[in-house]
Amino acid sequence: MPTVISASMAPRTGASQVPRTMPQAAQGKGTEAGVGNPGGKYSAIISRNFPIIGVKEKTFEQLHKKCLEKKVLYLDPEFPPDETSLFYSQKFPIQFVWKRPPEICENPRFIIGGANRTDICQGDLGDCWFLAAIACLTLNKRLLFRVIPHDQSFTENYAGIFHFQFWRYGDWVDVVIDDCLPTYNNQLVFTKSNHRNEFWSALLEKAYAKLHGSYEALKGGNTTEAMEDFTGGVTEFFEIKDAPRDMYKIMKKAIERGSLMGCSIDDGTNMTYGTSPSGLKMGDLIARMVRNMDESRLRDSDLIPEGCSDDRPTRTIVPVQFETRMACGLVKGHAYSVTGLEEALFKGEKVKLVRLRNPWGQVEWNGSWSDSWKDWSFVDKDEKARLQHQVTEDGEFWMSYDDFIYHFTKLEICNLTADALESDKLQTWTVSVNEGRWVRGCSAGGCRNFPDTFWTNPQYRLKLLEEDDDPDDSEVICSFLVALMQKNRRKDRKLGANLFTIGFAIYEVPKEMHGNKQHLQKDFFLYNASKARSRTYINMREVSERFRLPPSEYVIVPSTYEPHQEGEFILRVFSEKRNLSEEVENTISVDRPVRKKKTKPIIFVSDRANSNKELGVDQESEEGQDKTSPDKQEKSPKPEPSNTDQESEEQQQFRNIFRQIAGDDMEICADELKNVLNRVVNKHKDLKTEGFTLESCRSMIALMDTDGSGRLNLQEFHHLWKKIKSWQKIFKHYDTDQSGTINSYEMRNAVNDAGFHLNNQLYDIITMRYADKYMNIDFDSFICCFVRLEGMFRAFNAFDKDGDGIIKLNVLEWLQLTMYA
């Protein structure tokens, strides 16, 4: 819940003292803090385990207002100014001092003269990919000020609190931070502006670091990640050596449309999230950072005289050189922003040009059309002005398109609306978003190379309903783009998480199965080839691909390359025309047994629980006690089945064992039930099991108990055994190696064979609840699961009087059903 931290409280270990009072304000001794609330796909489970504190997460406006009222500066409890917000892999050898901008310089400003790409200079962190995306973002003011909300400053209503907005897996989230920034020798350690007293880029980097858990989490990545987080767009990758002939036209249209573009040169290494782009480990990176800082200590003359304003350019610390600088000035393994495309006249011929920016704010291309190129004298003066040519070391430069495709290897384009790049017309695409999860042992089946489990992956039906409007194309074709994105892998790096290798396949659904939302089974994928698929499985946050297929119904199967890898994802489908994309979900139901003859049905406790509707939770009436206490109620005797010639040997065996254990009252408790069942089950040599546990037997009694006595008579026991026998057959069918266990991936089919039809979330929950660490389910757990399913379905149906699939319970009824199950 929100916490007020007293100004007299000591800072955390390793943290520098941070000012907490308003500038020139004598009143107010505190820092207002807020906490977030959890969420997730399994809301019923998560909500059950989250303390109900009665306080909602406070918004930026609420926190800002409270800080102003109390005259305190905001201090973020979720991202505190200490080493926990910096690095997680190891401790930094020197002490950073966290300072607010008014402590770093006089006259701090949030934005000076509008935010532009020259305001971004990389510091001592390997997040050039993120800064390259910021540079692209500054080219589109509408997008920029969605990420960076207006009306934030260090003068009017300053309270040490700022906020930024990012797209996060389908939603826009508002990230609130304080303005404490890590410094060394009174200089910002990480991203800084070209102006010493401008701080929007440093604060934006801090908000993005908070979103991912730490500054270290931003080390190494692809520009497309940040581009998508800034826009909610979808990214397409181009290997420049395999680029289409009209690549320049594609890039030109992307710039005109406001799309963001980044590019890079492969450094010959397999870059992963565990290392910096050249494979430099975090310890080596930190060591170089320390050397870098020591070599660039500020002289006394660099400090701002007291009372003087400072809008001088920042004295730049050269970034750690873990990328490889080439003789031409370009840097391998480094991310650049594409900030413009033009055609210029040179010696009577048109030359295609590309403008790029290095987020370091320095280190530029030194070939043709670079800032210091000797042949600029042959370029017309008006042409120079149009190209804004100036000889400055600001990290931005022109180069010819021919040189661009010769040196660069990758191009990333983030399309804001997924407009068709191949078309001269701008076309608005429709989009559908689906969230999903791979659960180990249930729905993490791996790629097509693993046919035994591939079919268990989440499946999404795609209905392409209308063909494209293209008069030049005679084919009846639907264009669409599929983008698969894995969630939270960067944030979970500190827990050892890395990006999975992911991809997807698309299959056409046979006409006879159109409209059928059933999960496609193993045999379908064994005998049907995919109609389309991602070009490769790759360890990137998102894999996207364009396709052209005829109108029909398809199923998309997203997967990791290897099975048993657990994680969350979102699947987005963009199409030129109307489409429908949804997860394949079975209707939750249970097959009701068909009665062969008229018999009086057994009435179970769960069927009669609604007779207690009039009772309150705190009532202790005799009626309530009689219904719940076996000591208060005498059980009416049940007629025993006659011992006829037709009675099987097994039934006679049961009767004899039951009589021996039950005694004169012919009723058994959970301990006695365990004894009976295990004596009978042990005679089945083909069923390898250690028998039933006491807890399983208690659940069985709760299922079959017809009067709330907590005991079973022979009739109830006989009915229970019939169910166990039918479930035993199913178990033996899937226990193909006769190990006494079944693979958890087979549980979906086993549950279905027993007449229970569940959706994907419930199959995931069953695996989490009943499978062991080897993803196996033993016989006892198997029966326990089926007993629970039978009981819960029966209880629900008893309360669902009108059959609309919705029930209403009071707290007593709810507790009766859940505690006695």
From Swiss-Prot:
GO MF, any single term: titin binding
EC number: 3.4.22.54
Keyword Metal-binding recorded: yes
Binding-site positions, Ca(2+) 3: 735, 737, 739, 741, 746
Region annotated Domain IV, chain positions: 650-821
Stored Gene3D superfamilies: 2.60.120.380, Cysteine proteinases, EF-hand
Region described as Disordered: spans on this chain: 1-34, 603-652
GO cellular component, as recorded: cytoplasm; cytosol; myofibril; nucleolus; nucleus; plasma membrane; protein-containing complex; T-tubule
Domain of life: Eukaryota
Compositional bias per record (Polar residues), positions renumbered to this chain: 641-652
A biological process from GO: positive regulation of release of sequestered calcium ion into cytosol
Organ and tissue specificity: Skeletal muscle.
Catalytic activity: Broad endopeptidase activity
Active site per UniProt: 128, 334, 358
Keywords assigned by UniProt, alphabetized: Calcium, Cytoplasm, Hydrolase, Metal-binding, Nucleus, Protease, Repeat, Thiol protease
Binding site for Ca(2+) 2: 705, 707, 709, 711, 716
Region (Domain III): 418-586
Pfam families linked: Calpain_III (PF01067), Calpain_u2 (PF16648), CAPN13-like_C_EFh (PF21875), EF-hand_8 (PF13833), Peptidase_C2 (PF00648)
Regulation of catalytic or functional activity: Activated by micromolar concentrations of calcium and inhibited by calpastatin.
Residues at which Ca(2+) 4 binds: 800, 802, 804, 806
Region of interest: Linker: 587-649
Subunit comment: Homodimer; via EF-hand domain 4. Interacts with TTN/titin. Interacts with CMYA5; this interaction, which results in CMYA5 proteolysis, may protect CAPN3 from autolysis. Interacts with SIMC1. Interacts with UTP25; the interaction is required for CAPN3 translocation to the nucleolus.
Family: Belongs to the peptidase C2 family.
Function: Calcium-regulated non-lysosomal thiol-protease. Proteolytically cleaves CTBP1. Mediates, with UTP25, the proteasome-independent degradation of p53/TP53.
Name of protein: Calpain-3
Taxonomy of the source species: Eukaryota, Metazoa, Chordata, Craniata, Vertebrata
Gene name in the database record: CAPN3
